[in-house]
Amino acid sequence: MGKKITMLADGFVDEVWEIISTRSSRDNFALYTQMSQFAGRIASSGTGGVGLEILRKRRAFGGFTANIGYAAARLGVDTTLIGVYGKNKPDPVFEEVSELCRVFSLGDPATTHVFEFDDGKILMSHMEAVQDINWKQIVDCVGHSAMMALLEESDIIGIGYWSLMPSFDEIFENICASLPQDGKERRFFFDFADFRKKDEASLAISLEKLKAANSAFPMTLSVNEHEAAALFASYGEAFSDDPGRSIKEKAEYIRQKIGLDEFVIHSPEFAVAASSRERPAFAASVFCEKPVRTAGAGDTFNGGYIAARLEGKGLEERLHMANAAVGYFIRNAIFPTTGNLL
C-alpha cells in the first residue's frame, strides 16, 4: 500500500472481567449478561453496600493508539505509535503490537478495568499515566528530527482520545505548526471517546480549533451512537438509528455545523458518514447478539475505516470495510487481516 499513519498519544492495559450474578458451586455460576441486569442489582441495593464477584476474562492492550493502530496495521497499513506502553520496554501485553508497528514509548501505560456484557461494556480507567502527556515529552522521546520526519511521511495522523487528554489542544496545535507545506495532503483522524466526561465549553474550544485548521488539513471525526446522540443534542438535533428518519442528512447537518471534512458514526446496527467531497453514505451491519469481545470494537471499526481510506475506497465502501472489520473482531476476538475480510 505504501501509505503511513502516525497515532498518538495514549496507552492502556485493559483488565477485562465478567461479573458473576449467582454461584451454586465452584464450577457452576451465572453471569450478568445484560447491562440492565447489573444496573438493577446496583439500584436495588439502595443506600446499602453491595458485594460482587468478578471473573477474569483476559488481559489485553487497549487505547486509541494501540487498538486503532494495530487494527490498521493488520490490514496492511504502515503504522507508527507514540504513547505509553512501558517505561524501559513495552509491557508484554503490547508485544504483538510492537512486532507489527513502530512504537515509541513515553512511560508505563494506564489501566482500564473493563466489565463486559453481551450488550455492552463498562470501562473504569485509572488515568494518571496518560494525563501528563504533552508535546515536549513526545518530541523528547522521539527526537526532534525523527518526529518531524514522521509527520512529513504520514498520510493520516491520529490523536486520541480527546476526552482523556488534557493536552489534546496543545499537541494538535504543535503538530499543525510542524507539518510542512509541501502540497501533500495529510489528514487528521479523531475519536473523542465519551466526551460527556468533559464540559461543553472544552468541546466547543477543541472543535473550533479543528475547524480552523480543516482547510489546511482535512479532518475526520468518528463517534459511536451514544457520542453521536450527545453531539446531535448540542446542536438541537435528535439522533435516531432509524434509517427512515434521514440519518444521512442529519449526519451531513452536524458535519457542516462542526465544520470538519468528514464525520463518521458507527453503531452495532449500522454506520453512516458525511463528507464534504462525497454524498452521505449508510451501511447496515449484521448485528451480533452474543459478541465474544466488545472492548476495542469501535477502535477496530476505525482501523478498518482508515485502511479503506488509504486504499482509495469511496465513502460507502469505507463503511462496509469498517463494518466487516469490527464484525470479524467481535465474533472472533481477533483483529482481522485483509484475508479474513475477503
Feature annotation, model-predicted:
Residues 71-74, 230, 253, 304:
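Alpha-helical scaffold segments in soluble metabolic enzymes
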Residues 38-46, 292, 296:
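Membrane-targeting and insertion segments and their boundary/processing signals
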Residues 1-42, 57-60, 64, 78-80, ...:
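Ribokinase/PfkB-type carbohydrate-kinase core domain
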Residues 45-56, 92-93, 278-290:
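Glycine/charged-rich beta-loop-alpha catalytic/anionic-binding loops adjacent to active sites
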Residues 66-78, 307-311:
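Alpha-helix C-terminal capping segments
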Residues 262, 285-342:
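Conserved post-catalytic alpha-helical subdomain immediately downstream of the catalytic base
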Residues 72, 224, 298:
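Short, conserved phosphate/pyrophosphate- and ester-handling motifs at nucleotide-, phospho-/glycolipid
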Residues 63-66, 70, 303, 324:
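A structural signal for well-ordered alpha-helical segments within the folded catalytic domains
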